[in-house]
Amino acid sequence: MTSGVNSYASAVDDDFAKMKTLIGKWTGTLEWSTGDKPETLNLDYSVRSNGSAILEESNQGGVEMLTIFNVQNDKLQSTHYCGLKNKPVSYLISSTNGVMKFKTDIEGSGIDKSKESFVISWTIGLIEGEKDKFNYEYKVHNPDGTIVTRTAVMKRMI
């Protein structure tokens, strides 16, 4: 018999292993919920730190950013070094059928949501039977309370 903690830790490890299937270079067209002009999004995933971290290097319309995914204290987290000049730390809040949703810990990230825009959530949607495509979405919270959603279907380059 396994304890609930061990079962949860195992599920988190499974989700981290699923993320490792993204290793490689990806490209897609980022659409905006505002109707703004779409732009190219390039992602490059690599495993780092003796297998304990996944590095996502992104280039969105010429703006480079980094996100590091790792398991800490039995939680899958991401730390995003953003072009908006802040550092949202997010935690996996759900994982169902390959769709992993992360939500930013606003207070823990030191973000003042009344003064700055920041990424409030990410969704990485693995597609069953498709190793060369996945859905990518993130939402930006603005100081006025509006949320802008950006989505792309990512296709493997290498």
Region spans (language model):
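Bacterial Sec-dependent N-terminal signal peptides
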Residues: 1-11
